[in-house]
Every structure is written in C-alpha cells, then in structure tokens.
C-alpha cells in the first residue's frame, strides 16, 4: 500500500475514501494529511507531556485509540503509508547514488574512463591552442597502458555483516525501482517489509554471490571498452593485454571472527561453489562468443563435473567417513578440477588469435575476468580475531605471557622471533583438520587445503580483528610458516579502536623490526592493512575516525621509507557500511570513495612512488543493493573506475593547510564521543529497550541472549553490543550520536574557522555531509521522550493527572517497575551532555537539517505503542513463578520490550485452550468446562503481539528513511 502522493522532501497523504477517519486524524498530527475531517478536534494533552511535541503527539494517538476514534488497524495503515513513502524516497536516493542508472549515461561514463586511461598512457597534455599533445610514442604508451591495467588497483569486498534488514523481495524491489528511468510513485503492495526469519549462512552466500556475479558482468563491460580501445590503438599487440584493474572479493563463509557456527566444511563447500561459478562462467562466455574452441570447452566441462562432485561430497559436519570420501575427490582429482588459471593460458590465447575480431574480443574479455580472479568468482578473505591467534601460539609454543600487557611485550616479541628462526613446515591433511581444536590453527589449515587443492596461485587474505600489537602479526606469520603457506596468504591487521588508530604505526613498526616480517612482505610484495569505520565511529565518532585513519596511513607511509620498504605495495582496505555512522557517504558513491581515500593521501603515496591498492566493503543486504541489478552494478563499477583512474594530484585544502585547527577540531570530537561512551547513561539508553526495536539481521549468533527465562543481562557498556546493532539502536532512538556527538563542542571552540572550512574545504564539507544526514534523522525531543518514558516520575505525574482510579493504579504499577530498573538518573545526565553539545552546534550552524515530519510522527506512534504495551501488561493476571519466570521478571522484560519471549512464557502459563469436543463418547455428555484463558489472549496477549509487530514495522520505515541499517 503506497502513499497516494510522494515527493522527495515531504510526503502528503491525499484526503479521500482510501483512508479511514482514524488514519486521517493520525496523519494530520504530523501535517501529513490535508486536514482532519470536520468535527475532528484534539484535546490538549496534560501538563506532563507539553513542551515535548513527540510525547504530545503520542498522547493524542493514545487518546484516539482509547476513545475509539482510531483502531490498531488504522495505526497499521498509517505505518504502511509512511513506510512505503520512505521506501520510494530510498529508491530514488539509491538511483542517484552511483550517478544514475541510465544506460546511455553509463555508456558515456565508460567511454570517459577509457579516454582517461589512454590520455594517461600517452601522457597527453593540452597545448596553448587546446589540442591534445602526446608525450609518449605508441610503443611507450602501450607499456604504460599495460601497466595501468594489469595491476589491480581496487577491490570491491562483499561481506556478510548483519545488514540483511528487510525481506529479500524488498531488497529486490528497491534495486528494481532504483534502476527505473524515472522515480516511481507507487510502492509494491506488501503487508510487511520485515524478514520472516534471520538469513542463514547459505542464504547470505547466495545473495552475495549473485551481487558478485553482477559485478563481474559490469567489469566485463568495462573491459570490453578498454580492450576495444586497445585493439584500435595497437591492433598488433592488444590481444596480449590482460586487464585486471578492479576485482571482486568475498569473505562470506570464510569469516570466523566471533563465531563458531562456520565449520571448515562450510568454508570449503562455499569456496568450491565459487570455483564452480568461475569455471561455468568461462565456459558459457566461450560458447556465447561463437569461437571455435572444442578442446578448451571439453577441458572446462571436465573441470566443472569434477568440482560438482567435490561439492556433493563435501561433509556437513566433522564426519570421519564423509571426510575420507571428500578427501579422495578433492586430493586425487585436483588436477582435473584445474588448480591454476595459467593451465588454460595457451589455449585461450590460441582461441583469441584464430577467432573473428568480434569473437576474439569476447574471449579476451572472458580471459581477463578469469585471470583477474583465479579459480573463483571472486578473491577470498578469511578473518579471525587476535585472541584466537594468541591462544594457538600459547598452546603450540607455551608462551604464557599476556600480549596485552606492555610489560611482557618485548619478551614476547623476542620469543616469537626466535620461534620464526626455527619453524619448519608440517604436512596438513584432512585428518589433522578433523582433530584440530584451536580455531586459528583450523582456519590456517583450511587455507592450506584451499591453496593445495582448489586454487594454487591466488593469495588468500588473512584478516586479524582486534590487532593491538606487532606480536599478533608475527604470531600469524609463525602459524603460516608452520603450515607451509606463508607465501600464499596476505596477513592483515584491522585497526578500528581509538587505541589501534592512535598506535597503529607503532604496531606496524614492531612487526617491521623483525627481519622475518620484512622478508615476508618482500616475498608477497604487499603490506595489507584494514581500517574499520564501524567500531571506530561508535567509539571516537565517525568524523574523527576518518581523520585518525588518514593520519595513520601517512605515518605508515613514513615507516616504509624509514625501513626502506617503499617497493612494497600497500593495500588499504576500508571496512565500512552503508550508513553515515559506519562510514558510508550519504549522497554520492563518488564522495564515499573520496571520503575513505582522500586525494591528499593518494597524492602523498604517488609522490613517494609507493604503489597502493584501495579496497572497500559492500556489507550485507544493504551493501549488495549497489549491485542489485545490472544497471546498478554497472553504474557502481563505472564510479569505481572513475575514482581508480583519477590522477593522484594534491589540491589546496584548508584542512591540510591549517593542521593545528584540524587536529584540535577532530580531537575535540573524539574526546566528546569517548566521554559519551563512558557515560553509564549512554549504555542504559542503548540497552533499556533498544535491542528489542530491531530484528535479527544476520546469521551470526546474537551477542545478547536471555537464558533460562530470567532477566536478560543488563548492558553496562556499549562494547557489549556489536557495532551494527549499536548503531541501529541509535537510529531507532532518533539520535545518531556516533556521527554528531562532539561536533558542537568542536565548532564552538573555533566558530569562524568552522565557517571558513565549511565554505573553502572540500574535505571538510564532505565530512559535514555525514553530520547533515545524521541531523536530518535525529531530534533531541525524540530522544528526550524515550528518556522520559524510562522515568518513574513521568509515570507518577501521569497517575496524578489521571481521574480514573483503575488507570491511575496501572500508571503507578509501571512507575514501581521502572524504579527497579533504575535507568532514570544516569540517562538524564547523559541527555544533558548530548543536548548541550547539540545546542552549541545549532548556534554555530543554524541552517543544519532537521528531522522529517514523517519520521517524527513514526517515533511518536511508537512511543504511544510502547506506553500502551506497558499499561496493558499491568492487567496480566497473577501467576505462580515458572522456573525463573516470575511476575517481576516478566515486567522487567516487558519494560525492555522483550515481548515475543514473554508471550511464549505466558502462552504456556495461560493456555488459550481448544474448541468444544463434539464427539460421541457412548454415554451421557458431561459439562465441558472452559478453563482456558481466551479472554486474556484476546484482550491482552494478542494486542501486545500486534503492537510489537507494528513497532518493528516502524523500525523498518525509519531505516528506509535513513537509507541503511546500523
């Protein structure tokens, strides 16, 4: 059901028969309907809610429901209308984000990329008359062209981060609407946009691989243009060029950081599927080209059949007999399955040399994609955390000191260097893999089996989360050497905490002091680094995080000079999400790349002659949207190519010209966000009922679970939440603190300079785009209304103003239960901290965006639903404790909105009962006394269930408005 009228800026639901009077009245509260019906008036709310328009609106909604002038069905209609309007606006933004999806515009942009590459190859410059003057001969230009294209410069990394926030058909509809030539004004008719269940790992893999294959198709379009231009420019030499400037990469199924539900058999099965996709793709491309290639096609078919058999035999658990059968197929038939793309190199070149020009180009494009990605549809990243590595080293080498203790750091570094001197490789087989208990060793052994039996040439990234010491990198190197694959993996630290971002250069230097690490870097030719924008954003603030990451990159560049390692390529992998709180620029994909990888840093690397590769993440369902259709995928790849081939030249920018101000400004933000994170009230407001506002959005096990029917553990620090739910909760509370906290304090310190930078610095303006978007979805009155809900005093005031004794007692009951939770004092002081900073920002930046009326109305409706659920819960009849489930526990969990689990308990305590038995039991019928609790179900439990579902649908509507989950 869609809004009758929609505009990018302001939805207006037209008056008419499609809406009930109750729905129209609710929409009118947010000025989203063209007026209430004649005679519809609003009673003024009581004094305790005046001064807060969100609570006032919530009170009016509740009053309409109580008076029978609106029903829950009316609320559901309103929520769907507002959700659908947000969906349409999100689709329009998605259309614009990669620069539009028009095929003609995309084609022109592709040709523009090719012109840029050719201009660079020939060294063309404009003469005094404006004509292009090449500075290189055709032969020299060919060498330069080849150099530009045959080195990978960018990787799109597809991850399974839990942002699968809506049903798959909703994502498909979003991508389809965004790919339409014109904005649509009628949303798809769906009762709910929510998922029926969290995605499984297999489902995540299916969605990721579909996005990757669309990305591969888009890369082929780019290569058609590049190789087509090469064939016209160098007709005798073009066919030997194998471009690979941009690649696709995945860690879906290979990421074991913080999860134990992915077995080595899962990783190998999914990796074999990616190999099969690659082989099938190449075979189909050669068939479609029309070239004569019978022998090559036969070889590819045999490889496909072999890999299919390997996949079918892959165990589903640590099953000994199944593993033996699998080993037979994967070890004994690895040559038939093809281990190295080079095996097909001569055959592919022969086909290109003998085919017609059109077929030759098609096969050359197919070969480029095949050689760029190896024996997989994408490159592979594995991931684990530093603790897992430390544990296996402690087990293998008996190092008992704690790597986190600085007092033991030097001794540990000395010990691991000694161990690297003497380490020798041990064999790896599936028997050893079956019995291995250490997760880090198991992952390294799994990688060893991949490079031995699936793909022998493509390096595998080995990402290490929570890296806090150079010791961790050397420990990973020891483990790789121990299993004989140190030349096959790219060890990469992840920097995302404030400590890691501030001390990251020291971590790298600790590793560089080891001759073994330097030897390893020279052997692989790359220093791989990963930068996390989610955790860094939530701990130091998103705007400060990017500044710290930028500084860290330049410090590492200096270290390479100090250690004479400037001939090593640096891989800069930015792990970010689609939301502003997680590093995704809100308005343009091109600005996202410029924000993550500022031209100033790129130019510094170029000036030093240090090669670098950029990588950035497309995370979960939200991230895959940019590859959700062929049109979106091609527009995204073109944007990547434009960024990748843009010459790295430094531009004047006050951010770099006045480093003292920049340092002070971003440090102030970081200090303010750090202070907020440490505030007990911040953890309280995140943990009170925030986790219950969002659905489970990934296959990764939840960090926060209720046990034994008791009260869920209280969140005492944001670190007890994962980063994505943390950020998603902030969005749902109407305050994107991770993006705007501290900005007011920083601006207040230098108001004139702040204004100057806003007007004169592209780098600064790009950062403020994040704040602008966050402010457009934040409102201090929304946050204050949440905090007031948690205040027993608010409920006492409601009780005092309530003339009906029954209702008064219910308010007092809620008050007493909230007193037991004891959120009030800390959340109030935390709010004062936030509001003071916000007032400072508004005084310096008065024209900053404000929240959309539709979003504010959604927040108000949800406040009304929460109040109604809490008050309704006070009517639940007395019951005897059921295990740990007592009435006190029940109310605490209801106040935390853990409604589904509470209702499961109540369904068991108060069974609805069955229908009357109408059978012949061969004697006079006795009275069938109805001892069921159907009235409680109809009047309490079912309304609570319906209202909770509506709250979750509101969360989806708000998420559509923001444009991303978490």
Regions flagged by a language model, labelled:
Residues 265, 424-425, 529-536:
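Short loop/turn segments at strand-loop or loop-helix junctions that form parts
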């Amino acid at each position: 059901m869609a809004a009758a009228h929609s505009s990018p800026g302001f939805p207006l639901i037209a008056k008419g028969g499609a809406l009930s009077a109750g729905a129209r009245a609710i929409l009118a509260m947010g000025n989203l309907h063209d007026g209430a019906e004649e005679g519809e008036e609003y009673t003024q709310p009581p004094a305790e809610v005046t001064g807060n328009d969100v609570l006032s609106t919530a009170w009016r909604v509740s009053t309409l429901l109580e008076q029978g002038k609106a029903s829950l069905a009316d609320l559901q209609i309103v929520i769907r209308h507002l959700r659908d309007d947000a969906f349409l606006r999100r689709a329009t933004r998605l259309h614009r984000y990669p620069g539009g999806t028009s095929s003609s515009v995309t084609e022109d942009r592709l040709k523009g990329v090719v012109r840029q590459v050719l201009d660079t190859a020939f060294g063309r410059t404009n003469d005094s008359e404006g004509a292009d003057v090449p500075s290189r001969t055709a032969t020299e230009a060919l060498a330069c062209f080849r150099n530009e294209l045959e080195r990978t410069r960018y990787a799109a990394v597809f991850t399974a981060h839990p942002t699968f926030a809506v049903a798959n058909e909703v994502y498909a509809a979003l991508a389809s609407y965004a790919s339409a030539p014109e904005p649509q004004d009628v949303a798809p008719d769906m009762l709910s946009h929510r998922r029926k269940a969290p995605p499984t790992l297999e489902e995540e893999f299916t969605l990721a691989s579909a996005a990757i294959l669309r990305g591969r198709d888009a890369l082929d379009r780019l290569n058609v243009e590049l190789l087509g231009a090469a064939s016209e420019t160098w007709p005798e030499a073009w066919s030997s060029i194998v471009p690979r400037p941009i690649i696709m990469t995945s860690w879906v199924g290979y990421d074991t950081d913080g999860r134990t539900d992915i077995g080595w058999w899962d990783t190998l099965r999914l990796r074999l599927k990616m190999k099969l996709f690659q082989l099938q793709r190449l075979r189909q491309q050669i068939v479609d080209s029309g070239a004569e290639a019978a022998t090559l096609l036969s070889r590819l078919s045999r490889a496909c059949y072999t890999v299919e058999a390997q996949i079918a035999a892959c165990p589903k658990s640590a099953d000994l007999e199944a593993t033996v059968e699998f080993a037979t197929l994967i070890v004994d038939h690895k040559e038939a399955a093809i281990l190295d793309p080079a095996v097909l190199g001569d055959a592919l070149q022969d086909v290109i040399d003998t085919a017609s020009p059109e077929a030759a180009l098609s096969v050359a494009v197919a070969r480029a994609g095949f050689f760029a990605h190896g024996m997989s549809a994408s490159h592979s990243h594995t991931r684990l955390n530093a603790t897992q590595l430390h544990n296996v080293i402690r087990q293998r080498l008996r190092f008992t000191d704690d790597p986190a203790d600085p007092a033991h750091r030097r001794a540990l570094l000395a010990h691991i260097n000694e161990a690297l001197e003497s380490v020798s490789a041990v064999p790896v087989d599936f028997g050893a893999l079956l019995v291995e208990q250490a997760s880090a060793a198991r992952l390294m052994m799994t990688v060893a089996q991949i490079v031995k039996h699936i793909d022998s040439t493509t390096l595998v990234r080995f990402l290490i989360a929570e890296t806090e010491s150079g010791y961790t990198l050397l420990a990973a190197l020891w483990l790789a050497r121990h299993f004989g694959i140190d030349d096959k993996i790219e060890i990469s630290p992840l920097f995302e905490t404030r400590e890691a971002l501030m001390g990251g250069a020291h971590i790298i230097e600790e590793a560089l002091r080891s001759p073994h690490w330097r030897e390893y870097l020279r052997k692989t030719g790359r220093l791989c680094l990963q930068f996390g924008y989610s955790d860094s954003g939530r701990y130091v603030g998103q705007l400060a995080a990017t500044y710290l990451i930028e500084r860290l990159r330049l410090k590492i560049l200096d270290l390479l000079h100090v250690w004479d390692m400037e001939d090593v390529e640096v891989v800069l992998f930015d792990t970010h999400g689609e939301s502003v709180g997680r590093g995704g620029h809100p308005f343009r994909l091109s600005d996202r790349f410029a924000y993550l990888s500022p031209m100033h840093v790129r130019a510094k690397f170029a000036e030093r002659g240090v090669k670098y590769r950029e990588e950035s993440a497309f995370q979960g369902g939200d991230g895959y949207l940019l590859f959700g259709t062929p049109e979106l995928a091609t527009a995204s790849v073109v944007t990547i190519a434009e960024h990748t081939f843009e010459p790295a030249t430094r531009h004047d920018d006050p951010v770099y010209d006045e480093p003292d101000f920049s340092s002070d400004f971003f440090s102030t933000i970081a200090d303010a966000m750090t202070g907020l994170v440490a505030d007990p009230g911040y953890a309280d407001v995140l943990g009170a009922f925030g986790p219950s506002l969002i659905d489970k959005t990934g296959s990764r096990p939840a960090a926060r679970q209720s046990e034994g029917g008791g009260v869920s553990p209280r969140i005492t620090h944001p670190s007890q939440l994962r980063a994505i739910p943390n950020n998603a909760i902030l969005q749902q509370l109407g305050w994107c603190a991770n993006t705007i906290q501290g900005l007011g304090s920083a601006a207040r310190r230098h108001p004139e300079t702040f204004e100057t930078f806003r007007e004169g610095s592209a780098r600064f303006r790009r950062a403020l785009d994040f704040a602008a978007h966050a402010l457009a979805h934040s409102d201090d009155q929304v946050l204050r209304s949440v905090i007031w809900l948690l205040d027993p005093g608010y409920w006492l005031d409601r009780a005092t103003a309530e003339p009906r004794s029954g209702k008064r007692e219910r308010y007092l009951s809620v008050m007493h239960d909230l007193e037991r939770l004891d959120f009030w004092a800390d959340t109030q002081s935390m709010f004062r901290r936030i509001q003071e900073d916000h007032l400072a920002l508004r005084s310096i930046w008065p024209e900053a965006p404000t929240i959309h009326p539709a979003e504010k109305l959604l927040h108000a409706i949800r406040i009304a639903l929460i109040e109604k659920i809490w008050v309704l819960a006070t009517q639940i009849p007395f019951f005897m404790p059921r295990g740990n489930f007592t009435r006190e526990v029940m109310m605490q969990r209801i106040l935390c909105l853990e409604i589904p689990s509470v209702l499961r308990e109540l369904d068991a305590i108060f069974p609805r009962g069955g229908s009357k038995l109408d059978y012949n039991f061969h004697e006079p019928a006795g009275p069938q006394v109805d001892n069921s609790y159907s009235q409680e179900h109809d009047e309490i439990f079912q309304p609570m269930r319906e209202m909770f579902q509506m709250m979750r649908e509101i969360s989806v509507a708000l998420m559509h408005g923001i444009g991303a989950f978490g």
